Amino acid sequence: MALTDISHPTDIAMLTDLYELTMAQGLWESGKANEQGCFTAFYRDHPFGSAYAVMCGTAELPELVENLRFTPEDIDYLASLQAPAGGAMFKPAFLDYLRNFRAHVNIDAVPEGELVFPREPMVRVTGPSLECQLLETALLNICLLYTSDAAD
């Protein structure tokens, strides 16, 4: 399924977990949002007992980066979240940052259809640390899901 098949492709930003968003706010608050960041995607064990997997999902990655936006509804939802100690979980200035968020990262990936093996990098993302943080969960979900399905 291409990301363009999703009825609302801008909703991709919320295909994450709260950890990624709170870490992004921490990077933003500490002034480290634009420091160089990098993460790699790999799998630990052979999916479904096979000796290898077939890389899938890399064709979707540029679209993922391009469509990573926070809708007004996303911002309203995030603004409604309460911190465990009380008060707003996300600062209004950080939510303003997310309103205009655009990712500018570099992605290096094993080509679509190539064999991949456990503990070997399949994808490497480099760029501003906050942008990498917000892309991590969605990217891992796409690549690892497609690749594990191809191994089945």
What are these regions (language model features)?
Residues 1-148:
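Ordered alpha/beta subdomains of enzyme catalytic regions
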